Amino acid sequence: MAVTRIVCVAGARPNYMKIKPVMDALERHGADVVLVHTGQHYDESMNDVFFRDLGIRPPDRYLGAGSGTHAQQTGRVMAAFEPLLDELSPDAVVVVGDINSTLACALVTAKAGPLLAHVEAGLRSRDWSMPEEVNRVATDRVSDYLLAPSPDAAANLRAEGYREDQVHVVGNVMIDTLLANLERARASDVLDRYGLTRGRYGLVTLHRPANVDDPDALRGLLKALGGIAGRCPLLLPVHPRAAERLAAIGVPAGIRLVPAAGYLDFIALQDGARVVLTDSGGVQEETTALGVPCVTLRENTERPVTVREGTNVLAGTDPDRITATVNRVLDDPPAPRCPALWDGRASERIARVLLEGGTARTRARPTDLAPGATSGPA
C-alpha cells in the first residue's frame, strides 16, 4: 500500500453523505483515516443529525469555520487547516463536492504537498455566476486525482486538458450512501408524523442564494408553488438560510413548512413523493436513484446526466414555466432509469484508485505534462 494516512474533509450537509462511504472503504483496506470537519454548516439540524443518521464517528478534528462571506469563510478554513495539515502530515487529502471548505482545503493541500483527491470532479454547470462552479473548477485544477461520478463529467475534464492518468470514472458516491441506508429510511415514520400519503404530495427544497436571497425571485417561486399546491399539496422542509425570508414574504396556502429533516427522514420523504421540486444538485441525483420525478428550479445543472439518463427535468425560474413543467410531469412522469456505475460501489473504486496510485514522490503532479506534450511553441 503506497498511501497509508488519508485526511477526509467534510464541511456541510452534502459532504457528509459523500465522505462516509469513502472513509469506510479506505479503512477496510487498512488506511489510517483522519476525519476533519470544517464546521461550515454549524446549525444542529443541518449538522449533528446527519452524523447520527449516517453513523459517522465524531470528527477527529473540528475547525469551527462558521458562516460569513465567501472570502471570510474560505480564509478561516485555510488558516485553520494549514497548521493541522502540517501536524498530521498525511499522504493524501480527500475533498468532496463544491463548497467553500472544499476549495479552501484543496488550496492548502496543494501548497503543502500531499496528494489531493477531488470526489465529484468534472461537474460543470457552465454558469460562472455560481460560487460552486468557481469552487469546482479551481479544486479540479490543483487535484492529483479527479474522481468523476459519470462519463460526462470525465469528458468535461478531458476537454479541459487534464491528463488521462488523473481522470477516473468511479460512479456516484452519494448513491452508495443512499442505497446503504434505503431500508432504514423506508422504515421511518416521517410520513405518518406529517399525515402524508405515499404518492399524494410534492416535496420542495430551496436553498440556493439566487432563489432565496433575491426577494423578487423568491416571490416568483412561491407564486408558482402556490399554483401547483392547488393540484398537489406541497411539503417544504425549511433550510436555515431560507427560513427568515420565507417568513417575511409569506407562504401560499397548500404549502406546509416543516423543520429541516434528518438524512433518513429526508430520503423517506423523497421516496414517497409524487414529485420533488428542488434547486439542489444532490436531490437531483437522489431522486434519479429512487426513480422519483424531479423538477429542478434552476436554468442549468452541473448534473446533466440526471436529465439525460434519470428522472430530472429543468424548469428554470420563470413562474409560468415552472407551473407548466410541473403539470406536464404530473400528467406524464419520466420513466425511472439510473446511470451506469450508480451501483453502490463508487467508494470501493475510489479506495482502489487512492491506495494503488502511488505517492507524491512517484506520481506526476497536476501541472506535469503528459508524455509527448509540449508547453509552448518549439
Where do the PLM segments sit?
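Donor-nucleotide binding loops and adjacent catalytic segments primarily
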Residues: 40, 48, 68, 186-272
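C-terminal amphipathic helix plus adjacent low-complexity
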Residues: 331-378
